[in-house]
């Protein structure tokens, strides 16, 4: 896993992240690129999983390292795959295409159903669900030449039985096989406010 940043732009009550304003420095970026260049001949495969913090907050760092890997791949011929776990708020279609072009083809984005705006608010307190859905709908308009995979992770609280959320997602993405849904129970991952939530 690669953690280019620890800062987040959401304030989820179940979040275990430290919310520190720490971003990968340019020196560290160069060290990572040199390390990959020096080590890649020893391996046939390279996989990078971008995590955080919220990775889309440091788009340029990810593009820098990923572009280096793509350039290396044209010369040294190794298999390369990259994934990203993101809240999707900043992942508009323009950013998505940039990531796609440097080899990031798989994304996991968490949506908390109809409770999303309460459990996954922006740091400023504003709603986030509508913007994420809009981003995903626009990404879905990309032609079939864009072969990507987006996993929509649905975190559910104990007793959450409103299945209309799945009907809603189905109406948006069921015809696009590049989208899939992962259902997961919210657990005590160490968030400071998780005790106030109905979890199993």
Could you describe each region identified by the protein language model?
Residues 17, 50, 84-85, 111-113, ...:
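Long, contiguous hydrophobic alpha-helical segments, chiefly transmembrane helices and signal peptides
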Residues 119-200:
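Radical SAM enzyme [4Fe-4S]-AdoMet core and its adjacent flexible, acidic
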Residues 9-11, 55-57, 88-93, 105-126, ...:
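Conserved radical SAM core fold
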Residues 96-109, 170-181:
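Structural recognition of alpha->loop->beta junctions
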Residues 69-74, 104-107, 128-132, 173-175:
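Short, surface-exposed linear patches
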Residues 26-30, 60-63, 93-97, 117, ...:
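Generic alpha-helical secondary structure signal
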Residues 46-48, 82-86, 107-109, 148-154, ...:
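Hydrophobic faces of well-ordered beta-strands that scaffold small-molecule active sites
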Residues 1-97, 102-105:
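Conserved alpha-helical substructure of the radical SAM core
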